[in-house]
Amino acid sequence: MKIKNYQPVGVQEERKTIHNLPRNHFVCIIHSSKGTGKTNTVINLIKDYDKTKFFQKVYLFSPSYEADPKYQHLNDGNYDLRVYNDFTNDIFQEVMEDIQADLDEWNHYLYRVKLYEKLQKAKSLKQFTQHDLFQLDEMAYDKPIAPFPCEPFSLICFDDLASNKQLMSQGKSLVNSVLLRCRHFRTSFIYVVQQYRNAVPKMVRANTDLFILAISKSRKDMEAVGEELTSYASLNDIVSMWEKATAEPFSYFVINLMSPNANLRFTRNFDEPLNAV
């Protein structure tokens, strides 16, 4: 018997991306010490995704946003940018309600599309329920207009918030519960941190699909990351590839666990394959 790979109803196919970027919803950790270009990396990542109009909304939580003029480069994207100078559970709840409202609006549009298609084939209005007829009347019996160019995908980025206890809770938290269901919300997450194990909750680390790692002078920090990825490569190989990838200025070691090509799982800056020495 041939086993089919069924996908959730209503979910679009993977979207186009450039380089070796994940083509679906992801959780990303950008780990970089001070002065190694974290902000620059975030901007490049978001802009590369924007080249294919991947995200419709970007929510940036960053207390240093106004003090860092580089972030102004994000203002000219094809997405709707929302910026927050702090993180609280209440603010995050509002963000998730906004995301859910967009998805509900999109799903209602899809329902109306099917209703309109049924109308084109129908021989009588008796085939429709009262609710359907009410919807058709609101549509003026015309083809519905899409509220967005495509199903709304969102990105939530947390930058410079390692000390925020509501966000970085090691136990149950609002963010952690949402992150586990990020694909249902069509939402990706980016955590930008200077420390790894002591800052990022274990649950987040265990569900990360994409690691972007800058040069590190601490083998201890490198091993802290590598020890959690030994099912993909040995600890020594991960450290060796990390050192090789970041030997040149502004180069990053990228671990993309979502890559459909195993040869591009470990790369320098997404598109230069690395092999364990």
Segment roles from a protein language model:
Residues 60, 158, 255-256:
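Hydrophobic side chains in beta-strands
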Residues 1-28, 119, 125, 130, ...:
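Conserved P-loop NTPase motor module
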